[in-house]
């Protein structure tokens, strides 16, 4: 445990230029303080000691703003920068030398028992406010953008952004935003179906022979061609990330 804590301590000076000296890190870095408490709580948890590990985790959350379940397995050299609002669930696994920013959630989905939280390989960076949910695998050297919501496995050496998370770089090469072979966009497909249905209903409405009304009602519809162009443009903007 002490070797792991030493790696946690050293990595701060490598990754944070604001770290001036060891005393400052010990007293003013809540992320490191949370890791110290977690290392102790996790050891007690492994000894199957009741209540005390959870109590220590709870006190750590009150002190640092970081909530790490004592059952979570964290590698060495982890840096939780700023810390406030970080939540790491019971069955989460975090590899060596990962960087986690404030507001990150490594959470579960559903109420099932067993492995239900994500697994992060080595050297993963999770940006501020990102959510990684469910029993998914995040490969080595992955970068997850701030505010992203990741719900599926991510291969190594990728950059993921957006809601839901999409791979935009793979091994340093930008991925075509319209290529959904890796991460299909179900929301875009639903919107496409709805727009097609609206267009069909409008065509049916144009073909109706309505009886004359006492007062004229303006039911002028845009030409079909204009509606198709609007639909296609809207879909393309959505697929390219508009509104995310």
From Swiss-Prot:
It is found in: Cytoplasm. It is an enzyme of class 2 (transferase). Its EC number is 2.3.1.30. One of its GO terms (cellular component) is carboxysome. Keywords: Acyltransferase, Amino-acid biosynthesis, Cysteine biosynthesis, Cytoplasm, Repeat, Transferase. Signal peptide: none annotated. Pathway: Amino-acid biosynthesis; L-cysteine biosynthesis; L-cysteine from L-serine: step 1/2. One of its GO terms (biological process) is cysteine biosynthetic process from serine. It comes from the Bacteria. It catalyses: L-serine + acetyl-CoA = O-acetyl-L-serine + CoA. PROSITE patterns: HEXAPEP_TRANSFERASES. Its main location: cytoplasm. InterPro entries: Hexapep (IPR001451), Hexapep_transf_CS (IPR018357), LbH_SAT (IPR045304), Ser_AcTrfase_N_sf (IPR042122), Ser_O-AcTrfase (IPR005881), Serine_acetyltransferase (IPR053376), Trimer_LpxA-like_sf (IPR011004). One of its GO terms (molecular function) is structural constituent of carboxysome shell. Belongs to the transferase hexapeptide repeat family. This is Serine acetyltransferase. It comes from Synechococcus elongatus (strain ATCC 33912 / PCC 7942 / FACHB-805). The lineage of its organism: Bacteria, Bacillati, Cyanobacteriota, Cyanophyceae, Synechococcales. The gene is cysE.
């Amino acid at each position: 445990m002490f070797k792991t804590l030493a790696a946690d301590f050293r990595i701060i000076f490598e990754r944070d230029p604001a770290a001036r000296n060891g005393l400052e890190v010990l007293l003013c870095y809540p992320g490191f303080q949370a890791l110290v408490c977690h290392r102790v709580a996790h050891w007690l948890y492994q000894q199957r000691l009741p209540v005390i590990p959870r109590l220590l985790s709870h006190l750590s959350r009150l002190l640092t703003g970081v909530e790490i379940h004592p059952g979570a397995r964290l590698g060495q050299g982890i840096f939780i920068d700023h810390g406030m609002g970080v939540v790491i669930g019971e069955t989460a696994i975090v590899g060596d030398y990962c960087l986690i920013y404030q507001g990150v959630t490594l959470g579960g989905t559903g109420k099932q028992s067993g492995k239900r939280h994500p697994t992060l390989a080595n050297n993963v960076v999770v940006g501020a406010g990102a959510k990684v949910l469910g029993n998914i695998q995040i490969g080595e050297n992955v970068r997850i953008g701030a505010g992203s919501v990741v719900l599926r496995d991510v291969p190594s050496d990728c950059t993921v952004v957006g809601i839901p998370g999409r791979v935009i770089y793979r091994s340093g090469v930008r991925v075509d935003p319209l290529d959904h072979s890796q991460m299909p966009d179900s929301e875009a497909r639903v919107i496409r179906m709805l727009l097609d249905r609206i267009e069909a209903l409008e065509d049916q409405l144009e073909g109706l022979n309505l009886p004359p009304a006492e007062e004229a009602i303006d039911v002028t519809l845009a030409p079909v061609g204009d509606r198709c162009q609007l639909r296609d443009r809207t879909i393309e903007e959505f697929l390219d990330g508009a509104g995310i």
